[in-house]
């Protein structure tokens, strides 16, 4: 409980956490820190901003977060509708840098498992997006050709640049309308827009 630690605003804590989490995920993706360091440091650095330097507490919060996070069922608007639409026309797979032990629980809890044939995690493959090897592995696993495949992703570097470098068409899902200078052929802010493209 955050109030027990003297932290009055959960919103401020979450905002600070998200900043640290994003920076650490970038370092993890670049193989500059380990999975364990990512898990431990994101809460340690957040708590440190409040004058709390407690590694054991940070680790405890981190483990609890990893346990509870996949159980959340909140989806983007139109998720099920669009997946039902795509499922009739395409074979779908997931490529993720997320932790192996979390992904299957997350998909199962949110009722999405049945839509995807393969869940390809960077931990299993041994390389992370945007490394082209994970995209090549995915194509091979799906028995698919580059020119018949398309990647829909919400991370410009890991997903969009990664797929582009691997020769795969991409659609950038940018729900927060993040401003960027990149020349993206297909960019959407709402999943319902996929019906117009696919």
Predicted segment positions?
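Secondary-structure boundary/capping signal
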Residues: 6-9, 54, 90, 94, ...
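A generic structural signal for short
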Residues: 31-32, 71, 92, 123, ...
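Glycine-centered short loops/turns at secondary-structure junctions
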Residues: 89-90, 167
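Catalytic-core regions built around general acid/base machinery
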Residues: 78-89
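N-terminal helical cap/lid subdomain that shapes the substrate entry/recognition surface
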Residues: 1-77
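A short alpha-helix capping/helix-coil boundary motif
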Residues: 20-24, 59-63, 81-83, 112-115, ...
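Asp-based, Mg2+/Mn2+-dependent phosphohydrolase catalytic module
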Residues: 84, 95-198
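Solvent-exposed, flexible loop/coil residues
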Residues: 28, 37, 42, 77-80, ...
């Amino acid at each position: 409980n955050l109030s027990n630690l003297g932290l009055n605003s959960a919103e401020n804590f979450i905002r600070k956490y998200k900043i640290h989490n994003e920076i650490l995920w970038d370092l993890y993706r670049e193989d500059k820190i380990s999975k364990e360091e990512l898990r431990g440091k994101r809460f340690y650095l957040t708590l440190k901003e409040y004058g709390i330097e407690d590694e054991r507490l940070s680790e405890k919060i981190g483990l609890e977060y990893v346990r509870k996070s996949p159980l959340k069922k909140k989806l983007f608007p139109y998720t099920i509708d669009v997946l039902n639409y795509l499922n009739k026309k395409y074979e779908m797979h997931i490529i993720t840098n997320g932790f192996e032990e979390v992904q299957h629980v997350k998909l199962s809890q949110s009722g999405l498992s049945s839509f995807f044939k393969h869940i390809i995690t960077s931990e299993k493959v041994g390389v992370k997006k945007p490394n082209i090897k994970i995209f090549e592995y995915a194509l091979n696993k799906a028995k698919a050709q580059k020119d018949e495949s398309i990647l829909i992703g919400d991370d410009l570097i890991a997903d969009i640049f990664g797929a582009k470098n691997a020769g795969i068409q991409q659609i950038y899902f940018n729900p927060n309308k993040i401003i960027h200078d990149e020349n993206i052929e297909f960019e959407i802010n709402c999943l319902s827009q996929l019906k117009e493209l696919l």
